Amino acid sequence: PFYFDASVKDIYATLRCGATMHIVPRKFFSLPKKLVHFLNEKRITCIDWVPSALCMIVNFRALDKEKPESLKKVMFLGEVMPTKQFNMWRKALPEVKYANLYGPTEATGDCTYYKIEREFEDTEPIPIGFACSNTEVMLLDGDTLVTEQDTVGEICVRGCSLAHGYFNNPEKTNEAFVRNPLQKNYYERIYRTGDLGKYNAYGEIVFLARKDSQIKHMGHRIELGEIETALSAVPGIRRGCCLYEHKTQKIVAIYEGSTEQKALTEALKEKLPNYMLPNRYVPLEEMPINLNGKIDRTLLKHQYIKEN
């Protein structure tokens, strides 16, 4: 949508380069074959969109009969990229260049950039990469800098791209835009994103989950994002989402696909320890999508999670 924060970059960068910008009609995001045809008809060369759009196209086999032949580059942002669906897309369009981006609105768009070149297993998360120019991205555990591989920390951002704060909301501003604990300069601020990440073996940042999606279950600290990655990699599952029901202390797996629950549980047992296995499964014909093109977790929580 043109009011989405990433649209600022899309609009002005496109026009500044002398390119032509096309806005995809919203109805096409529920009609994958129409969407692919639109890309061909308009001779689209570069796309910047959320992974949900890619998932919809590959899940409904919209590339089987028609491929966007003019496409040269695809950039993803706004959601975790399901690796299985990305591999299916890249297999159909191997000549296209791909990039995975990350960046909250509070940091004026993209903070990290990752050029996807190597191969990934379906269960392996695609990194968000390294910090963009004029931006520093760090992982903090409290006020301590995280540098070790596979150690979880909160993704924090500093640099000239930071916003001044939230309009007419000083309380929220003071919570998120805080003094840099690694610098003596009292006035230097960083933005705590509320997102959790880690470094992989290549030194790349891997997004894990929202901080508020980290739960304590059966005495173990669990990242729901890890369960979602394993769920989305199961054959027959097009998209998956995991929520936690605090009232009953149950992990709820909501998914789009035809896989039977028994087969799904057996597949997850091969990838996850018992304490991370979902306690309840909710199959859907199609995941709800919000106005920004992402999975509507708020709606799913309202419909399928029992609160107080």
Residue ranges: model-predicted function:
Residues 5, 24, 49-50, 60, ...:
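Short hydrophobic "strand-cap" motifs at the C-terminus of beta-strands
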Residues 5-45:
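Conserved AMP-binding/adenylation subdomain of ANL enzymes
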Residues 56-59, 84-88, 109, 165-166, ...:
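Phosphate- and divalent-cation-binding pockets in alpha/beta enzyme and binding domains
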Residues 97-100, 115-308:
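AMP-dependent adenylate-forming
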Residues 33-36, 65, 228-229:
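Short hydrophobic/charged patches on amphipathic alpha-helices used for structural packing
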Residues 11, 16-19, 44-48, 58-127, ...:
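Gly/Ser/Thr-rich phosphate-binding loop
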Residues 52-54, 81, 162:
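Alpha-helix capping/helix-boundary segments
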